[in-house]
Amino acid sequence: DSDSVDLLQRQPKRPGSTVSWWHLIQSSSDSAATAASWFVSPSLGDDADRQGLIEGLRNGVIDAVAVHALPLDDEECLLPPDQRQRGVAGHQHVLPALWQALVVTRGWSAEELWDILSFKPATLLGRTPEQLALGSNRWLLFDPEQTWTPSRDDPSASKAANQPWLHRAVKGKVVACGLRTPKSHCG
């Protein structure tokens, strides 16, 4: 939450830190935040907390975005909340959601978004950030204008029961990537 960002900012030597993508696009006041099929930890804050996290990420107090995907099946989602794992699934939602929330709504550049999604997480983990090179399979093609509807029936989609926005139109989609075989797609 925004108090945590303030605490990090006051540290003379800041520890590495990440924020979940879901905390950047949802708040406790959003209807999607009350879905019965998933819960996140820490819980979502209010809109001021979300704004504080976004500002902390943009000004470097928070280093990177974390996905922390945790797919649950239908049975697991039937358990009472205190008896199941906390988390939200849906890698395919991350780039479209953050594109809309940060690039479209808040004016971030594509480079700033990619930095917090790829380069800074690699650096935080002590890995060499990826570079686009001829012959590399480390690439993706994202269409920010393509609208699609996530469904568990899609052969390339997650089968997790705890993913947000099932059967709801989403704008922006990864349409191809080098890490997939020719038989599968990325969306």
Provide a role label for each language-model segment.
Residues 5, 25, 73-75, 149-150:
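Glycine/Thr-rich phosphate-binding loops of Rossmann-like dinucleotide-binding domains
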